[in-house]
From Swiss-Prot:
Sequence repeats lie at residues 157-163, 164-171, 172-179. Changing C107A: No effect on dimer or capsid formation. This is Capsid protein. Disulfide bonds: none annotated. Phosphorylated by host SRPK1, SRPK2, and maybe protein kinase C or GAPDH. Phosphorylation is critical for pregenomic RNA packaging. Protein kinase C phosphorylation is stimulated by HBx protein and may play a role in transport of the viral genome to the nucleus at the late step during the viral replication cycle. Residues 149-178 have a biased composition (Basic residues). InterPro entries: Hepatitis_core (IPR002006), Viral_capsid_core_dom_sf_HBV (IPR036459). Pfam families: Hepatitis_core (PF00906). It is found in: Virion; Host cytoplasm. It comes from Hepatitis B virus genotype A2 subtype adw2 (strain Rutter 1979). Keywords: Capsid protein, Cytoplasmic inwards viral transport, DNA-binding, Host cytoplasm, Host-virus interaction, Microtubular inwards viral transport, Phosphoprotein, Repeat, RNA-binding, T=4 icosahedral capsid protein, Viral penetration into host nucleus, Virion, Virus entry into host cell. Changing I97L: Frequent mutation in chronic HBV carriers. GO terms for molecular function: DNA binding; RNA binding; structural molecule activity. Self assembles to form an icosahedral capsid. Most capsids appear to be large particles with an icosahedral symmetry of T=4 and consist of 240 copies of capsid protein, though a fraction forms smaller T=3 particles consisting of 180 capsid proteins. Entering capsids are transported along microtubules to the nucleus. Phosphorylation of the capsid is thought to induce exposure of nuclear localization signal in the C-terminal portion of the capsid protein that allows binding to the nuclear pore complex via the importin (karyopherin-) alpha and beta.
Amino acid sequence: MDIDPYKEFGATVELLSFLPSDFFPSVRDLLDTASALYREALESPEHCSPHHTALRQAILCWGELMTLATWVGNNLEDPASRDLVVNYVNTNVGLKIRQLLWFHISCLTFGRETVLEYLVSFGVWIRTPPAYRPPNAPILSTLPETTVVRRRDRGRSPRRRTPSPRRRRSPSPRRRRSQSRESQC
């Protein structure tokens, strides 16, 4: 059975696979982050969100996997076999857990739409030949800001609020102001 754990969240395993394996922090760092930011919600008997539920499940799976790894470490006599199991867990299962934890923590922190937009942006960036792409990859925490800049105000700062001098405003607000001043006098 081929189950995609990201499907109900609008993402796919393939979308996350564009991010290199060294992109994801260690499981320990991700667990510490989840605990620091969401401990109360994760330990609560109440349902908070599907991301909290998925995060709980990933944390529980990692705990069970560590229990199994400890058992294997204590019961496998052959050091070569033990190393094979440990390497497999760290390389394959560890990466999947790191991806899951990162995805759900990021969705809770930045919002699902921002994370999905980031994954698509990074996927486009990484598949673009180096000669034709910007030197730096998109950054998740600044994505909404840079997306607005690229789409609407190419070359301008994102905070610019004053209209350009060529644009003229409708005369009606000025008339209203002048009429109200006259009535106050």
